[in-house]
Structures are given as structure tokens and as C-alpha cells.
From Swiss-Prot:
<dbReference type="GO" id="GO:0005886">
    <property type="term" value="C:plasma membrane"/>
</dbReference>
<keyword id="KW-1003">Cell membrane</keyword>
<keyword id="KW-0812">Transmembrane</keyword>
<comment type="similarity">
    <text>Belongs to the UPF0316 family.</text>
</comment>
<dbReference type="Pfam" id="PF10035">
    <property type="entry name" value="DUF2179"/>
</dbReference>
<dbReference type="InterPro" id="IPR019264">
    <property type="entry name" value="DUF2179"/>
</dbReference>
<protein>
    <recommendedName>
        <fullName>UPF0316 protein RBAM_006820</fullName>
    </recommendedName>
</protein>
<feature type="transmembrane region" description="Helical">
    <location>
        <begin position="41"/>
        <end position="61"/>
    </location>
</feature>
<keyword id="KW-1133">Transmembrane helix</keyword>
<dbReference type="InterPro" id="IPR022930">
    <property type="entry name" value="UPF0316"/>
</dbReference>
<dbReference type="Pfam" id="PF18955">
    <property type="entry name" value="DUF5698"/>
</dbReference>
<feature type="transmembrane region" description="Helical">
    <location>
        <begin position="67"/>
        <end position="87"/>
    </location>
</feature>
<keyword id="KW-0472">Membrane</keyword>
<dbReference type="InterPro" id="IPR044035">
    <property type="entry name" value="DUF5698"/>
</dbReference>
<feature type="transmembrane region" description="Helical">
    <location>
        <begin position="9"/>
        <end position="29"/>
    </location>
</feature>
Length: 184
């Protein structure tokens, strides 16, 4: 049956396309895992990735006289990047740190965020137009959009900057954030 599919040019194009989407999705996820320090998981993914890659590449190189196979390979690569990024978004690996500065001094806002389950460090900061509340919030990435919505609901004019921390060590966050469940 596989021989029949491979001899059919449409079947060959579809197989090459699908194989390359799978390969590049694995590649994208592996790179993200590597950047996030998940080296052993990334190494496991790379083993599967290379098996898929060699299979797809051999199909294309064995049939270079058929331009549609090369085009399918290129399209699969582009689609694989998109699919890999979508998968990573769904996995939402790692943590984000959000720095928030309120429009006005609001000492109740950090308490409201803590009640919802977020780890918040807050302080009074001096701005151009007076004192404001500044906060630093660490949360798993899977709660990122929910955190933004919560902050906008509590202070629609709050200024926010988010980034992914490379290293987290010590303090309340290390144990508590891993166990924490954010409330709706």
C-alpha cells in the first residue's frame, strides 16, 4: 500500500508535506525546550525529529526531478513552524514576570491579586504625576492572558511590561508558584 502511495505524485506530495510539518514542529518545540533549559526532554524530542527528517529528506532527494516534491517540502517547513509555535503556545511552558505600575496609588490592588492566587511583590513608586503602586508578579505562562485581563479589570490604565525570566532562585516564588492555582 505504501508503495502505491509513493508512486502516486499527489500521494507523494502529501506525505512529504505532512512529514515536514511534523519534523519542523518537533524542531520548533525542541528549540524552545532547549532555550527554557529542558535539555533532556529536548534531547528526546531531537531523536524523533531526526528520524522524521531523514525520512522526509530521502523522499525529496530520491525524487528531485519532480518540482512538486520540493515545493511540498518547502511548504511543509513553513507550516511546521506555525504548527510548532501553536503547540508551544498550548503547552505554555515556563513562567512570566509582569511588572505593573498603576495609574494612581492603589494599595488594595496587590491584595486583590494575591486573593486570586498570584504571587505579588509591591511597593510605592514615585511617578511624574505622584505616587503609584508598582508590582512584580510571577506566574506560570498558562495564566498569562488571565493575569492581563484581571489587571485590566482592576485598573484599566495600568502600565504593564512582561518578560520571561531565565532563572528563578529562592524566595516565596520557588515553592509556592509551582503549587499555586489561579482563581477565575
Amino acid at each position: 500500500m505504501m508503495q502505491t502511495i509513493l508512486s502516486n505524485s499527489i500521494g507523494m506530495v502529501l506525505i512529504i508535506l505532512i512529514i515536514n510539518i511534523i519534523y519542523v514542529s518537533f524542531f520548533t518545540i525542541r528549540m524552545i525546550l532547549t532555550l527554557k533549559g529542558q535539555r533532556y526532554f529536548a534531547a528526546g524530542i531531537s531523536t524523533i525529529e531526526i528520524l522524521v527528517y531523514v525520512t522526509g529528506l530521502s523522499l525529496v532527494l530520491g525524487n528531485l526531478n519532480q518540482i512538486q516534491n520540493v515545493i511540498a517540502y518547502a511548504l511543509g517547513y513553513g507550516l511546521g513552524v506555525i504548527v510548532g509555535m501553536k503547540i508551544e503556545e498550548k503547552l505554555a511552558l515556563g513562567y512570566i514576570t509582569v511588572n505593573v505600575i498603576t495609574k494612581e496609588l492603589d494599595l488594595d490592588l496587590p491584595k486583590q491579586l494575591r486573593e486570586k492566587g498570584y504571587g505579588v511583590t509591591s511597593w510605592v513608586a514615585g511617578g511624574l504625576e505622584g505616587d503609584r503602586t508598582a508590582m512584580q508578579i510571577l506566574t506560570p505562562r498558562k495564566y498569562e492572558l488571565q493575569l492581563y485581563d484581571t489587571i485590566k479589570t482592576l485598573d484599566e490604565k495600568a502600565f504593564m511590561i512582561a518578560f520571561e525570566p531565565k532563572t528563578i532562585h529562592g524566595g516565596f516564588w520557588v515553592k509556592a508558584v509551582k503549587k499555586r492555582r489561579i482563581k477565575e
